[in-house]
Every structure is written in structure tokens, then in C-alpha cells.
């Protein structure tokens, strides 16, 4: 299976030093789309996460993702969320993300909670942002998810910067990229 995932995260609302340097960015939402071996969408996953480190949302984060503190308070703790997500992924899967930051922050959050054993590393993944550049541009540039969506003239039915929406856009872009491009 292909698991295309996206994360949203928060940071210190004061914008100054991090209260806990081990977790500069705290994951607050996981969204994912699952494709089968025929590259057909077979399932989705979405989970809000109740913050433990940064209880208030940084202003710039709030402007972008449009989630408020009260919504996050209804979320579940990260350890439960990551277990649900990995269970949803199943036994055999390949991760796909837009860029490399989500994988890095996922591992950092799992390390913070002492949960790296749930996903033995190194974590292998495909960077759809890079694949987009290889297939449609110069192989070097890194474009925004919205740019790629517009470039491919894909319909924009949801707001960007929500985890499930961004995972869905990334999955639709991936479907425009042939498997041969992934082998390169």
C-alpha cells in the first residue's frame, strides 16, 4: 500500500526559545490517504492531537491552518494518535510526503514520547515534492503543494494546510507521476 501523509504542527506561541528543545514543533494533526497496489484510493485517516507542550497556538500557525485551541482540546494524546495511525497503515506500506519535513517531525515527536520502537528506522519514504520536480520541472526546484496542484490543473475542493486536505492533494499529484519516475 501507498500511505500519503501530512502533518500539521505547532510551535512556541511566544515565538522565542522553545520550552523543551527536544520538541521545537509539536504535531497537532495527522492526515493520510491510502492507495492500493493499483494506485486507487482505498481509505483516509484524520486525527487531531491534543497538545502537551505548546498549549496555545502560535499566531502564524493559526492563520495558516485555521485550527483553534478549543478544537485541539478535543483531540487525543500523541501516543494514542500515532499508534492508531500506524495500525491504520497496516503491515506493508510505503510512505509518501510533500517534502521531507513531515518525516523528520514525525520521528522527532515519536522520540520525544519514547515511541521510536513502533516504527523502526531508518524510515524510508518518497518525497512527492521532489518527484514532481523530476517529472515536470528541472529536478532541483521545490514548489509549494498549491503550485503543483495548479500546475496540474487539479480541482481545489478543500483549503490547504489541513493535514487530510494536503495529504489528498499530494495523493492526486502522485497519481500524475508514473512509477518509473519513482525508481530514479
For each predicted feature, which ranges?
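Entry/capping segment at the start of metal-dependent catalytic domains
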Residues: 1-38
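Short intrinsically disordered, low-complexity coil segments enriched in acidic
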Residues: 1-2, 70, 139
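Short secondary-structure capping micro-motifs at structural edges
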Residues: 19, 83-84
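Metal-dependent phosphoesterase core characteristic of DEDDh/y 3'-5' exonuclease domains
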Residues: 24-30, 34-65, 86-184
Amino acid at each position: 500500500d501507498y500511505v500519503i501523509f501530512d502533518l500539521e504542527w505547532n510551535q512556541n506561541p511566544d515565538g522565542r526559545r522553545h520550552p523543551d528543545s527536544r520538541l521545537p514543533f509539536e504535531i497537532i494533526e495527522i492526515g493520510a490517504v491510502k492507495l492500493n497496489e493499483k494506485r486507487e484510493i482505498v481509505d483516509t485517516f484524520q486525527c487531531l492531537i491534543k497538545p502537551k507542550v505548546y498549549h496555545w497556538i502560535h499566531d502564524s500557525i493559526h492563520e495558516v491552518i485555521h485550527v483553534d485551541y478549543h478544537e485541539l482540546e478535543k483531540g487525543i494524546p500523541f501516543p494514542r494518535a500515532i499508534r492508531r495511525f500506524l495500525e491504520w497503515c497496516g503491515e506493508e506500506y510505503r510512505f509518501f510526503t510533500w517534502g521531507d519535513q513531515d518525516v523528520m517531525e514525525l520521528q522527532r515527536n515519536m522520540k520525544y514520547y519514547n515511541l521510536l520502537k513502533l516504527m523502526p528506522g531508518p524510515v524510508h519514504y518518497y518525497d512527492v515534492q521532489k518527484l514532481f520536480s523530476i517529472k515536470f520541472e528541472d529536478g532541483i526546484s521545490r514548489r509549494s503543494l498549491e503550485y503543483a496542484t495548479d500546475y496540474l490543473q487539479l480541482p481545489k475542493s478543500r483549503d490547504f494546510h489541513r493535514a487530510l486536505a494536503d495529504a489528498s492533494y499530494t495523493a492526486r499529484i502522485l497519481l500524475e507521476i508514473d512509477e518509473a519516475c519513482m525508481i530514479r
